[in-house]
Amino acid sequence: MRKEWVEKRKKDSVRTQMYYARQGIVTEEMEYVAKVEGLDPELIRKEVARGRMIIPANINHLHQKPMAIGIAAKCKINANIGSSALASDAAGEVEKVKVCQKYGADTIMDLSTGGDLDAIREEVIKHAEVPIGTVPIYQILHDCNNKIEDLTIDKMLEVIERQAQQGVSYFTIHAGFLLRFMPLVAKRKMGIVSRGGSLMAAWMMHYHKENPFYTAFDDILDICRKYDVSLSLGDSLRPGCLADASDDAQLEELKVLGELTLKAWDKDVQVMIEGPGHVPMNQIERNIKIERDYCHEAPFYVLGPLVTDIAAGYDHLASAIGAAMAGWYGASMLCYVTPKEHLGLPNAEDVREGIVAYKIAAHAADIARGRKGARDVDDAMSDARYKFDWNKQFELALDPDRAREYHDETLPQDVFKEAEFCSMCGPKFCSYKITQDILEKHGA
């Protein structure tokens, strides 16, 4: 849908959404986002220019539908997919893309680490109408035959540009983890739980040199500026357990991410900040406020956070609790967690479960923040329930298939779609029906 929009800007020296916004130009992408969000296009432009909102939209992903991540927009969710060395199948990842889009993921990250990574990514982008994000260090390591000591800045930049050419709309870059933070890591209960962060630690300790993503950050920005790839500044030192939440390692890295944010903005590159992780409920609001302060109000993109460490098999629920709170306090995007978190590679059904849990969290946050129209669908659902309009209830549910499936387990016949009861209460104990009968008999 963006082919004509991108083509007419082909001769512009800079083609990032932030650049145009700062020039006072409302792009077609901004117009599209404004309609979807129900906001004024000029507000979208101002938020993008200020850095409080990003529109991740690589100039080479032409069939992508524009979307916005920022405090003024609806709370978004990201779904992770990707192969591993033990399970690498492009068709399987495409199936996950379809599930992600069916159930409402706003962005998708391809975290593949096994198989033909370029081919998998190409298929993922081809089938995606939402922005695709990646973590380039995974392919960099893959292309170095899994020998982190063979990583060079030239190899790093080559992979980053290759992925940008393919149409990746945002990169997680682990540039804020500096060599001097290693003593802080040693004090932790669980050390480093970020894959990218642990790889950077291994490289830095092998060479006793500074993080190459940090030293080559200007070169990375040049690539992002060329293709309008947004940066998702990775939290290599996010807490992986409640005991490590809000510690010095996490917060010192966050300060560096704030410095890198300003560098990116100097080159008109859009930025969001990645956040924890595992955080007790009583620390979530503080984490949001600290990010806003340290990182100049750049959009905050959080993984959960999980509010307990003992929910294995149900981490999508433990994290959705924290995600709803984070969204309420000001996080702009929530990275989903599936039931397989900490246990294994998620399949398509796990992806569905994670997305729906996070759609609930994001929607709850939008209602709590008073976003315009957020509660309209809830009010419509209430009307449908009170009227016993079963088909309308299924239609309005975040997961219509699951709602219908559960109803039909006990009352599958079509006649029960007109019934004024469900199998929970039956025809004699339905509170709605009893209330309606009272009002009909005695008046309101």
From Swiss-Prot:
Say if the entry is tagged with keyword Protein biosynthesis: no
So where does [4Fe-4S] cluster get bound? 422, 425, 430
Chain residues that bind Zn(2+): 278, 342
UniProtKB keywords: 4Fe-4S, Iron, Iron-sulfur, Lyase, Metal-binding, S-adenosyl-L-methionine, Thiamine biosynthesis, Zinc
Query: Which EC number(s) does UniProt give?
Result: 4.1.99.17
Q: Lipid metabolism among the record's keywords?
A: no
Q: Name one GO molecular function term.
A: 4 iron, 4 sulfur cluster binding
Looking up InterPro entries in the UniProt record yields: ThiC, ThiC/Bza_core_dom, ThiC/BzaA/B
Cofactor names from the entry are:
[4Fe-4S] cluster
GO CC term (a single one): cytosol
Tell me the pathway: Cofactor biosynthesis; thiamine diphosphate biosynthesis
Q: Which residues does substrate bind?
A: 80, 109, 138, 174, 194-196, 235-238, 274, 301
Reaction catalysed by this enzyme: 5-amino-1-(5-phospho-beta-D-ribosyl)imidazole + S-adenosyl-L-methionine = 4-amino-2-methyl-5-(phosphooxymethyl)pyrimidine + CO + 5'-deoxyadenosine + formate + L-methionine + 3 H(+)
Q: Which GO terms describe its biological process?
A: thiamine biosynthetic process; thiamine diphosphate biosynthetic process
- State the free-text cofactor note: Binds 1 [4Fe-4S] cluster per subunit. The cluster is coordinated with 3 cysteines and an exchangeable S-adenosyl-L-methionine.
- What's the top EC group for this one? lyase
Instruction: Report the family membership.
Output: Belongs to the ThiC family.
- What job does this protein perform? Catalyzes the synthesis of the hydroxymethylpyrimidine phosphate (HMP-P) moiety of thiamine from aminoimidazole ribotide (AIR) in a radical S-adenosyl-L-methionine (SAM)-dependent reaction.
Under the subunit heading, UniProt states:
Homodimer.
Descriptive protein name = Phosphomethylpyrimidine synthase
Q: Which gene encodes it?
A: thiC
